[in-house]
Amino acid sequence: MVKAPSKPITLEEFLQQPETKPASEYIDGQIIQKPMPQGKHSTIQTELSTTINMVLKPHQVARAFSELRCTYGDRSTIPDISVFTWPRIPRDVNGEIANVFPISPDWAIEILSPEQSQTKVTKNILHSLNHGTQMGWLIDPNEQTVFVYLPKQQPDVFDQPEQLLPVPAFASGLSLSLGTVFGWLLE
């Protein structure tokens, strides 16, 4: 859903507004509300975040965050899962994880909801890649397909259960097949 303000607002003005439920993103001068996650989306998001954190977090390699606002390059988006390498996780003066993430994730993962535009989600992934993201995934639960995006390369499509999904180099300890990801929907 798009909310058209009576006059255009800046990114800074958008960031001063109260959060909405579901969350809204600021893209190309527009405020766009994300759809409310449904069962398949929520299952994959929870299981994938947990799996990534189980493998990468104990060794302080990286950490996965769900629904985290990332603001960079004149956009403020909320990837379904944002993975940051350990040294890039913003911290406050106490060394705790900061509330504001003014950088792109190292790995951006989006899970397509039935009412969501694949084009808009793909544009967010491409925007991230243009601002330092190493890899983007677009997971389509209805098609049981994962599109993998790398900077300045054509996307790869994974649609066979036995296919291993590529991960960024920092996540080389993580091994996931397409069948594993969509198998979570059967548990």
Q: For the regions a protein language model found, what residue spans apply to each?
A:
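Gly/Pro/Ser/Thr-rich low-complexity, intrinsically disordered segments predominantly at protein N-termini
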Residues: 1-187
